[in-house]
């Protein structure tokens, strides 16, 4: 971990930013309705990416929220590309 969070701190940060997953899913709601994909699978992929984003976050490179949202959007692109 670049940020020095303990596991407990990391988990708390992840819980505080779960709303980011919902935000990204709402932004891609039209695609999710049109694609044959289970929203629970998408949520799980985004949740794993959220944990990884918090683990790899470097405070010297910007705000945590922006980093998390960019990582979740990248994960959504990856999920979409696997459905093509």
Language-model regions, residue ranges each:
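Alpha-helical promoter-recognition and RNA polymerase-docking modules of transcription initiation factors
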Residues: 1-84
């Amino acid at each position: 971990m670049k940020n020095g969070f303990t596991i407990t701190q990391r988990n708390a940060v992840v819980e505080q930013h779960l709303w980011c997953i919902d935000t990204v899913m709402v932004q891609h709601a039209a695609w999710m309705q049109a694609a044959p994909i289970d929203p629970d699978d998408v949520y799980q992929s985004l949740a794993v990416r959220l944990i990884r984003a918090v683990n790899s976050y470097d405070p010297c490179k910007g705000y945590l929220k922006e980093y998390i949202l960019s990582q979740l959007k990248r994960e959504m692109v990856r999920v979409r590309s696997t459905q093509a």
